[in-house]
Swiss-Prot record:
This is Small ribosomal subunit protein uS5. It comes from Verminephrobacter eiseniae (strain EF01-2). One of its GO terms (biological process) is translation. The gene is rpsE. The N-terminal domain interacts with the head of the 30S subunit; the C-terminal domain interacts with the body and contacts protein S4. The interaction surface between S4 and S5 is involved in control of translational fidelity. With S4 and S12 plays an important role in translational accuracy. Residues 17-80 form the S5 DRBM domain. Keywords: Ribonucleoprotein, Ribosomal protein, RNA-binding, rRNA-binding. Signal peptide: none annotated. HAMAP family: Ribosomal_uS5_B (MF_01307_B). Part of the 30S ribosomal subunit. Contacts proteins S4 and S8. GO terms for molecular function: rRNA binding; structural constituent of ribosome.
Length: 172
């Protein structure tokens, strides 16, 4: 079973990125001679200003698995547009059986989200958001569904550009 451990990892890197470990699982591979034990880690990395990435790593030791996951998260970063510490509009993300619904929140509301979603929002730089998950509570699926929702959120200027209109026409 996954252990939720959203704690900040500090390995002395000075790249200005926030790192959080979401889950560490003990995994086994059954071979002719018995079982081979190992660990799988799930982590997220963000700059606190709209860039976030997730990674997973496996190794026979926990620190090595976490390190691999952090490196993969750094390689897989995506840019998300934020507005005053929240998202622009309601958005839904899916991955497997996990469904994540997010809504912008007023200033001072804080991060109203549970489990792995909270860790993603903290490293992303979101300060006010309301999020709810349905279906699967698997941390990996929840993080992927959160990323799906964040990547599919758009700004008013992006919508206006797609429609060939001005931003004022969109809000009229």
């Amino acid at each position: 079973m996954a252990k939720f451990q959203p704690k900040v990892q500090d390995e002395g890197r000075d790249d200005g990125l926030r790192e959080k470990m979401i889950a560490v699982n003990r995994v086994t591979k059954v071979v002719k001679g018995g079982r081979i034990l190992g660990f799988a880690a799930l982590t997220v990395v963000g700059d606190g200003d709209g860039r976030v990435g997730m990674g997973k790593g496996k190794s026979k030791e926990v620190p090595a698995a976490v390190q691999k996951a952090m490196e993969e998260a750094r390689r897989n970063m995506v840019k998300v547009s934020l507005k005053n510490g929240t998202i622009h509009h309601n958005v839904t993300g899916h991955h497997g059986a996990a469904v994540v619904m997010m809504a912008p929140a007023p200033k001072g509301a804080g991060i109203i989200a549970g489990g792995p979603m909270r860790a993603v929002f903290e490293v992303l730089g979101v300060t006010d958001i309301v999020a709810k998950s349905h279906g699967s509570s698997n941390p990996y699926n929840m993080v992927r569904a959160t990323f799906d929702a964040l990547v599919h959120s758009t700004t008013a200027s992006q919508v206006a550009a797609k429609r060939g209109k001005t931003v004022e026409d969109i809000f009229a």
